[in-house]
């Protein structure tokens, strides 16, 4: 992994520091939580605290009220824009959202929240859509909600073994909360979920 990074003497970072930076870049995280990143990386809390302190001192991350933010300096440390494409992602659900619920409001209500065995990881924003990310308590599955205008897609990224049942349960825990947020106006409609090559359609 270290060969994907600039060998710049100005950065006094170790291998673990670089591994953390690689994950932050891989996930395109703009903000993240300590607890979520700890589970994502499987690191001891004290180890991660020391790493984040070094990254903060180097200007790669900054503390915020609701966790940490990733600064633009991370781009200075990259030779290219490496992303690991070998992960196992599965689309669990695609649905429409009420058009009269602003995306910003929905994101604000979801970010930082815990659902069942899902723990908040962080958020990425490409300007056209927002992706909110959670991780299971055991760090085995990452669940992502992609929100773009009136569309919602929920995906699972398997970091350990591929447990579809756990992923689907996590997906519906998240969808249930989103439905509650939308219920004053209109509930989420026409949800479909995918398992392998099969697709299923449900109605609200």
Where are these regions (language model features)?
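Short amphipathic alpha-helical interaction segments
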Residues: 42-57
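Charged, low-complexity intrinsically disordered regulatory/assembly segments
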Residues: 117-204
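Short, cationic-aromatic polyanion-contact patches
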Residues: 4-17, 66-85
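Short Lys/Arg-enriched alpha/beta "domain-start" segment
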Residues: 81-131
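Long, contiguous binding/interaction regions
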Residues: 79, 86-87, 169, 181
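Short acidic, hydrophobic short linear motifs in intrinsically disordered regions
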Residues: 28-40
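A short, conserved structural fragment
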Residues: 56-66
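Short amphipathic alpha-helical interface segments
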Residues: 14-30
